[in-house]
Every structure is written in C-alpha cells, then in structure tokens.
Amino acid sequence: MRSTRTRKSETTMILEVATLIVRAGEGADFEQAFSQAQKIISSMPGYVSHQLQRCLELQDKYLLLVQWQRLEDHTVGFRQSQQYQDWKKLLHHFYEPVPTVEHYEPVFVAQHSVREGRA
C-alpha cells in the first residue's frame, strides 16, 4: 500500500459528502430517479466523479460522494444553476430529512497497488 500526505499548495480535488435519508419504501424509486439525475451533475463544469453508496445496516440511508475540482464548482457553479433546480425536482422529494452536505479535502491518500500476475 502506498500512502502520501498532500500539501495545501498542491491542487487537490474537493470531496462532497452528502448523507441522504430516503423515505421508507422509496429506495427503488429514488435509485431510478438518481440514474437520470446523475446525467445532470456529471455534465457540470468542475465535476470529476461521483458514487452513490447504499448503507448495508440502514436500508433507507445513502451516501453521495462527488469529487469536484474546486469547492466553488459545487457551491456556486452547480448550486446556483438551472441544472440544480432540475436535480432538485428529480430527487429532493425523496429525502426525509433534508440531506447533510459537507466538503472535505485530502490529508492522506493511500492506494493499494496490484502488480500484474498477482491474485
């Protein structure tokens, strides 16, 4: 495993972490709506990648992880756009309560390197 410490002076991506609680019994509909909504977010300037993770212990809880080039790409570029209004129409009626959204910057990054021919 390789681990590196990032420096503030380095250009680092921002990780948006949204904790989503979906109304009971609406998970399948939420996931279907998200399959459409992800096309919106992935088209935004500054977008890098995203993952939607479902909690194993709490079936109505999800984590949305979005990497942005800069904080402002999310907080201004996306949140103040018409595309965000479209995103909200598709998804926000599923949430109970309102999602918690936080932003993180890397401190340590570790990566397991897999060598060719190794199982």
Whereabouts are the PLM-identified features?
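Generic structural motif
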Residues: R23-G25, L71, P106
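An amphipathic, aromatic/His-enriched active-site/gating alpha helix that lines ligand/cofactor pockets
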Residues: K39-V48, Q67-E102
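Glycine-rich beta-strand-turn "strand-cap" elements at beta-sheet edges
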Residues: R2-T11, Q51-L58, K88-A119
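Residue-level signal for secondary-structure boundary sites
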Residues: A28, E72-H74, V109
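Short, surface-exposed ligand-recognition loops at beta-strand->loop->(often short) alpha-helix junctions
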Residues: I21-E31
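Conserved GNAT-fold acetyl-CoA-binding loop/helix
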Residues: E31, S35, Q82
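Short, well-ordered beta-strand segments in beta-rich or mixed alpha/beta enzyme
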Residues: I14-I21, Q51-R79, G117-R118
